[in-house]
């Protein structure tokens, strides 16, 4: 089945905005759940449907997932590094809604810290990483066709489409641009190659 209708959670974040733009340009009919619709771009590619709400509210998530064929999860906490359950709570609601609506494909972004030595996580990032771990466990136990995307440092370099994807956290570099990361999230919708895997996209930028 060719996926055409997708929901993006976290569409107003750094990677979310470029993923949203690339998805619309690629012809997807995109629904987004946002807390504040003013954070969506005022010009350029627009989502087909906007649900204003909170990923921690099951009813808001259910409304967003209804009628979709796949889901992209780019939840984050921005620059807030305090203890959080937003990403895991949101993911639990997304999984529940997907099962309720018969949607079985989800591509979700966490972090390469889940692939690397846990003792090497910088202390200031430990709380966010702990929630990424909870989020990943929910995906693993979901029974859905999930792709766990675990990027290294996310940069602002231009789109190349020439990144390397490995399954073990080792690659040509410890950076991926937000544009290439978005490109990879969308690529995962067109293949089953990475279903059930942890993936590490990276690229040696000039």
From Swiss-Prot:
Domain of life of the organism encoding this protein: Eukaryota
EC numbers on record: 1.5.1.30, 1.3.1.-, 2.6.99.-
Keywords: Cytoplasm, NADP, Oxidoreductase, Phosphoprotein, Transferase
Residue(s) carrying Phosphoserine: 42, 82
Gene Ontology biological-process annotations: heme catabolic process; megakaryocyte differentiation; negative regulation of insulin receptor signaling pathway
GO CC terms of this entry: cytosol; nucleoplasm; plasma membrane
Sequence positions that bind NADP(+): 10, 12-13, 15, 35, 38-39, 54-55, 75-76, 87, 109, 132, 153-154
Entry keyword annotation includes Coiled coil: no
Catalytic activity: reduced riboflavin + NADP(+) = riboflavin + NADPH + 2 H(+); bilirubin IXbeta + NADP(+) = biliverdin IXbeta + NADPH + H(+); FMNH2 + NAD(+) = FMN + NADH + 2 H(+); FMNH2 + NADP(+) = FMN + NADPH + 2 H(+)
InterPro entries noted in UniProt: NAD(P)-bd_dom, NAD(P)-bd_dom_sf, Polyketide_Oxido-like
Compartments, as annotated in UniProt: Cytoplasm
Active site: 109 (s-nitroso-cysteine intermediate), 188 (s-nitroso-cysteine intermediate)
Keyword Phosphoprotein: yes
Major location (coarse): cytoplasm
GO molecular function: biliverdin reductase [NAD(P)+] activity; FMN reductase (NADH) activity; FMN reductase (NADPH) activity; peptidyl-cysteine S-nitrosylase activity; riboflavin reductase (NADPH) activity
Inactivation phenotype: Adult mice do not show defects in biliverdin degradation or hematopoiesis. Impaired cytoprotective function in stress hematopoiesis, characterized by divergent erythroid megakaryocyte fates. Defective stress erythropoiesis is observed in spleens and in bone marrow erythroid development, in conjunction with defective lipid peroxidation. Mice on high-fat diet gain weight more slowly than wild-type mice and are protected from diabetes due to improved insulin sensitivity.
Membership in a protein family: Belongs to the BLVRB family.
Self-association state and partner proteins as the record states: Monomer.
Function summary: Enzyme that can both act as a NAD(P)H-dependent reductase and a S-nitroso-CoA-dependent nitrosyltransferase. Promotes fetal heme degradation during development. Also expressed in adult tissues, where it acts as a regulator of hematopoiesis, intermediary metabolism (glutaminolysis, glycolysis, TCA cycle and pentose phosphate pathway) and insulin signaling. Has a broad specificity oxidoreductase activity by catalyzing the NAD(P)H-dependent reduction of a variety of flavins, such as riboflavin, FAD or FMN, biliverdins, methemoglobin and PQQ (pyrroloquinoline quinone).
Protein name per the record: Flavin reductase (NADPH)
Organism: Mus musculus
Biological classification of the source: Eukaryota, Metazoa, Chordata, Craniata, Vertebrata
């Amino acid at each position: 089945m060719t996926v055409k209708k997708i929901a993006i959670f976290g569409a107003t974040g750094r990677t979310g905005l470029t993923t949203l733009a690339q998805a619309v340009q690629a012809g997807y009919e995109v629904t987004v759940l946002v807390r504040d619709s003013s954070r969506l771009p005022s010009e350029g590619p627009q989502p087909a449907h906007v649900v204003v709400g909170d990923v921690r509210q099951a009813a808001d998530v259910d409304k967003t997932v209804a009628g979709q064929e796949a889901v992209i999860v780019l939840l984050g906490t921005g620059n807030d590094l305090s203890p959080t359950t937003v990403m895991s709570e949101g993911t639990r609601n997304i999984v529940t809604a997907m099962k309720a609506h018969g949607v079985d494909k989800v591509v979700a972004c966490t972090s390469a810290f889940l692939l690397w030595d846990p003792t090497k996580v910088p202390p200031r990032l430990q709380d966010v990483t702990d929630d990424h771990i909870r989020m990943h466990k929910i995906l693993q136990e979901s029974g859905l066709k999930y792709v766990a995307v675990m990027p290294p440092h996310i940069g602002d370099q231009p789109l190349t489409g020439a990144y390397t994807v490995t399954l073990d956290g080792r690659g040509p570099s410890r950076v991926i641009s937000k544009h290439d990361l978005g490109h990879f999230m969308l690529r995962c919708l067109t293949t089953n190659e990475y279903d059930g895997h942890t993936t590490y996209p990276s690229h040696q930028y000039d």
